[in-house]
């Protein structure tokens, strides 16, 4: 009985000790928590400076592989994601040009990487191509958003191009007015679509490049590319690009000589962006005209000729020189709206001696053409001005993007074509052409004003 009583007393003492321990632990926890709370509330911490950078909406970035961009310029709407553009859109990068271009050949050889475009000439004398089956040429290209600064004979040199925004589909409503006299087809923005050439600008990394090329039979080219940025925040940039090329092309007896120099000056301020591009060019192509039409039976075709065959008469040549200038400026008015101005002007002159139309042949490859040789002297000027506003606003939860622009384009063209007496062209696809005595080189005459044109428009998009 005594042992049982002792055991009970021991258990009661142990319970008292446990309660004291639990009470002590609880009090200690409260005191520690209070102390920590006081330290946390009273301390001041200074974090290291954190810089956050991001691409502004609409900036251009290449997709994986580097051949096409994920954004493109859509007329007065500016740079947009290709997923937000309601047309078939492709923006080819500088890498695409470096991969697929031949400096001695027209730009159409690169453009045909777009499924909407096919090259429609093998002649270095022309920039012809087709988009969705409609013939186009250098006249239909835009330069930094300015239309009609290139021609059927000369297009933009490959080495000045940063990217090419190709919009397939009827999008004249976002590009403003254009000239109706533009070579193969009228209008710089016809139904098939538009091609906007964006020139190279100075990047943050300085560039000093000298490049040599060899193509064709003996065409040797030299290129320079120099760029720098300066200013307290690298806001000013300058890039100089030049080319000299001379030699024989892949087509036998065809020669090309090209000289040009261009400069791109840009400024990126806190609330405005300005870009100025200017340069001069001089291009001559001797021989190399390739225009053929088939006039034989529809169920028979002649065998393919040797590509070395010469189809030009002696003295065939085409030459053009001139200059151009574009100015683009955009000023941010507030967080939602901005004002923009686009202006461009050019002047070119040149002459040519060539046969005036295509060589027609039958199912045996024999030529069946009558034609004339001609001497043409031409001068042309184009000008363009556009100003407007663009921005965004909300109606409830819906965000709207809108642009309003007024533009005016003008052009003048002086021309004189002196034709020889009409004569027959004999020969065939395999032995070449034989021209009658009437195919002589006529004398060049002074160009006269042929036409002038002014267009004004308002664009809301």
Can you say where each PLM-predicted feature lies in the sequence?
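N-terminal Sec signal peptide and the immediately downstream disordered periplasmic leader
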Residues: 2-102, 108-115
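Non-catalytic regulatory/gating segments with a bias toward low-complexity or hydrophobic composition
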Residues: 89, 97, 109-111, 164-169, ...
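Short acidic/polar hinge/loop motifs at secondary-structure boundaries
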Residues: 119, 128-130, 146-176
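A beta-strand signature from Gram-negative outer-membrane beta-barrel systems
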Residues: 159-209
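Face-selective signature of the C-terminal outer-membrane beta-barrel domain
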Residues: 325-348, 371-461
């Amino acid at each position: 009985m005594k042992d049982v009583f002792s055991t009970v007393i021991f258990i009661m003492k142990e319970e008292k000790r446990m309660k004291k321990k639990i009470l002590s632990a609880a009090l200690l926890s409260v005191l520690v928590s209070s102390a920590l709370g006081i330290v946390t509330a009273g301390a001041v911490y200074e974090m290291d400076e954190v810089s956050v950078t991001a691409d502004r909406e609409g900036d251009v970035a290449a997709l994986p592989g580097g051949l096409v961009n994920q954004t493109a310029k859509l007329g007065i709407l500016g740079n947009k994601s290709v997923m937000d553009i309601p047309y078939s859109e492709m923006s080819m990068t500088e890498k695409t040009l470096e991969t697929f271009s031949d400096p001695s050949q027209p730009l159409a050889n690169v453009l045909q990487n777009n499924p909407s475009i096919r090259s429609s000439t093998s002649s270095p004398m022309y920039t012809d191509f087709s988009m969705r089956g409609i013939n186009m040429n250098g006249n239909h290209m835009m330069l930094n958003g300015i239309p009609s600064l290139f021609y059927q004979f000369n297009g933009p040199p490959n080495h000045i191009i940063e990217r090419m925004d190709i919009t397939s589909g009827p999008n004249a409503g976002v590009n403003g007015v254009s000239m109706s006299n533009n070579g193969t087809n009228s209008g710089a923005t016809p139904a098939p679509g538009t091609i906007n050439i964006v020139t190279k600008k100075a990047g943050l990394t300085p560039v000093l490049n000298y490049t040599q090329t060899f193509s064709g039979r003996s065409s040797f080219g030299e290129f320079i590319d120099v760029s720098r940025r300066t200013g307290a925040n690298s806001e000013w940039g300058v890039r100089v690009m030049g080319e000299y090329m001379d030699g024989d092309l892949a087509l036998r007896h065809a020669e090309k000589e090209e000289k040009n120099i261009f400069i791109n000056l840009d400024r990126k301020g806190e609330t405005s962006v300005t870009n100025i591009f200017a340069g001069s060019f001089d291009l001559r192509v001797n021989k190399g005209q390739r225009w053929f039409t088939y006039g034989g039976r529809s169920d028979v075709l002649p065998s393919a000729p040797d590509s070395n065959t010469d189809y030009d008469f002696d003295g065939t040549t085409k030459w053009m020189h001139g200059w151009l200038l574009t100015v683009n400026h955009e000023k941010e008015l507030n967080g939602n709206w901005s004002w923009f101005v686009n202006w461009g002007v050019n002047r070119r002159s040149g002459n040519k001696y060539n046969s005036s139309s295509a060589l027609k042949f039958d199912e045996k490859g024999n030529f069946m053409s009558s034609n004339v040789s001609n001497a043409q002297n031409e001068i042309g000027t184009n000008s363009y001005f556009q100003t407007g506003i663009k921005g965004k606003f909300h109606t409830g939860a819906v965000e709207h993007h809108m642009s309003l622009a007024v533009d005016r384009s003008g052009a003048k063209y002086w021309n004189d074509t002196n034709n020889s007496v009409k004569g027959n062209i004999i020969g065939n696809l395999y032995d070449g052409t034989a021209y009658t005595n009437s195919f002589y080189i006529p004398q060049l005459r002074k160009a006269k004003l042929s036409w002038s044109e002014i267009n004004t428009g308002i664009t809301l998009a």
